[in-house]
Amino acid sequence: MQNETASHGINFDALGRDRQSLDLASESVELEVPGLNLFYGAKQALFDVRMNIPKQRVTAFIGPSGCGKSTLLRCFNRMNDLVDGCRVEGEIRLDGHNIFAKGVDVAELRRRVGMVFQKPNPFPKSIYENVVYGLRIQGINKKRVLDEAVEWALKGAALWEEVKDRLHESALGLSGGQQQRLVIARTIAVEPEVLLLDEPCSALDPISTLKIEELIYELKSKFTIVIVTHNMQQAARVSDYTAFMYMGKLIEFGDTDTLFTNPAKKQTEDYITGRYG
């Protein structure tokens, strides 16, 4: 399969990342999924998903619309709890602890596992207050602590130099790409362990998309990142590992280079080469 899939021009080195040899089996595990099923009412949406998400790596979920990739992503911080009729069977373990166990503090889980959505969603507040929002909820109000957190998070989101002189202006005045980086700053300000990105570039122009992709590459030194994307070129550029999903099932999961150039499953090859999807 190698020649055919490689001929589709997937560019693995657009970000200049280190193409080191990766071995999923030897990675430290951040999120463990030993068997997960999910139902919306009587309809099953995820079927016995089993995977380990490696620590401080970028894992991409790809697959056609409706394949379950965003549904699975939202399981990792229990956002599906907010969907009427949604029911989960099985476990997801964060640092060895089942996030669906009784007594789990869901608010604390969502601090540890932050999420950025498709459309930038800054609050109608100042740039500064957007970044410190989660910290204030935690009862942190000392100005020095907040000031340091704002600078750290905005630098981490590659936005500090663009906004440092207008921190108290409305976040709604930022461009779409800047707003998305602000949302990332707001998410990392509470120092999560995992960042979930649900098609974070789908509403952005190519220049803003490149900035987000470069940011993802920088952030993985501090955070475990899981990204859902419809853009296979993007998955190839930013991720270390890629999972291909189809009709609620995990078809193939492995290092990105191998999955795109020499997939093990015919379904994966068909999707990558554009035969369906």
UniProtKB/Swiss-Prot annotation:
One molecular function GO term is: ATP hydrolysis activity
In terms of one coarse class, where is the protein primarily found? membrane
The keyword Transport appears for this protein: yes
Stretches assigned to the ABC transporter domain: 31-272
Q: What class of enzyme is it?
A: translocase
TM segment ranges? none
Where it sits in the cell: the answer is: Cell inner membrane
Task: Classify the protein's membrane topology as the record does.
Answer: Peripheral membrane protein
The free-text function statement in the UniProt record for this protein reads: Part of the ABC transporter complex PstSACB involved in phosphate import. Responsible for energy coupling to the transport system.
Family under the similarity heading: Belongs to the ABC transporter superfamily. Phosphate importer (TC 3.A.1.7) family.
Known partners and oligomeric status: The complex is composed of two ATP-binding proteins (PstB), two transmembrane proteins (PstC and PstA) (Potential). PstS is missing in this species.
In Swiss-Prot or TrEMBL terms, this protein is called: Phosphate import ATP-binding protein PstB
- In its UniProt entry, the species of origin is given as Pseudomonas aeruginosa (strain ATCC 15692 / DSM 22644 / CIP 104116 / JCM 14847 / LMG 12228 / 1C / PRS 101 / PAO1)
Q: Which gene encodes it?
A: pstB
